[in-house]
Amino acid sequence: MPASIFVFADLHLGHPDSPGLRWALQELEAAANSGATACVCLGDIIDRNATASECVPQVRTVLDRAVELFNEVHFISGNHDTHDELDFPPEVTVHSTQVHTFQIGETTVLSAAAATDPDLRRLQLPPRPSDAPFLGLLHSSVTGEFSHAICLPLSVDQLRACGADAWILGHVHSPLTLADAPFIGWVGMGNGLLFDPDTCHVTRLPN
């Protein structure tokens, strides 16, 4: 059975508007109960202005729980995450800032983590490698009109040109959808998305 993938982003622990540790733990439980077997944090799990002594242990608590609930857990940093030395469980795969692909079950995932704050790099994205399910994950402001800060800028056309079945994005805090076919949109703060490799559809986890 293909692994369904749960994605969350922009938790921003330590920010006044963060949904908080309790929400994160409940969302992980809800995703696991929905049938997701893999979990991806798509950046900004901690706020750049967070008190590290308080919030870095909270990050570890979230990721420890994810490891307990899912067969695999992946971390793709956002621009805010670059300010702190985060403590990762050994079971968590922390991804490179370079463009790369990796496998979650039968799904090929294309990604690159943010390296700096801001991260102004313009990435060169490769084309679809095969007929297998293909998911793009990026912490990006895209063309910037929905963001206060630039992060890994690119266009919707560049995302489409890769041929991915969906692009799930972090960085913008509102759960906005830029395109429906294929899905291109931001998770949003206080939200979670599910990618089903059987259908290649993206759905929002009910709050």
Where are these regions (language model features)?
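N-terminal active-site segment of His-dependent metallophosphoesterases
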Residues: 1-58, 130
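Active-site neighborhood of phospho(di)ester-bond hydrolases with catalytic His/Asp-centered motifs
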Residues: 7-9, 39-44, 72-79, 84, ...
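Metal-dependent catalytic neighborhoods of phosphoester/phosphodiester hydrolases
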Residues: 16-18, 43-63, 77-97, 147-148, ...
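Catalytic-core regions built around general acid/base machinery
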Residues: 58-70, 156-163
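Short acidic, glycine/proline-enriched helix-loop-strand junctions
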Residues: 62-73, 179-189
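Conserved beta-sheet core of the metallophosphoesterase superfamily
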Residues: 148-205
